[in-house]
Amino acid sequence: QKAAFFNTETETTVIVEDYGESVGVHVTDDGIAFIGIGTLGISSGKVYDLNTGTDLGDTQDWVYDKYGIIIPAGYINYISPDGRFVLGTKAESSAMGVSFINWYIAPPLAK
């Protein structure tokens, strides 16, 4: 299984084969794709530019470069069209099994 993204404007599908077993999780309007590595219990993520076919790095590196903050391991589920809000998930193992912890990035509340 490989990550795939369907462009509703051009009606074309881009299959990303760079990462082996992976899933397409989210893509922005400007073609930045967020890929979950693995197929059952995604534990990490990659960021990929669909327009240029370029690997933009791990989720953590991309978030640090774009927002200047450190996030836990994981992958991005959603980014708002304006880029101000990001939702992500991190897998965490324990004696009870694997839990999936959600995290987010949002601007500070107005005072």
Placement of each model-derived feature along the sequence:
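Conserved "turn/edge" positions that cap or connect secondary-structure elements
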Residues: 1-111
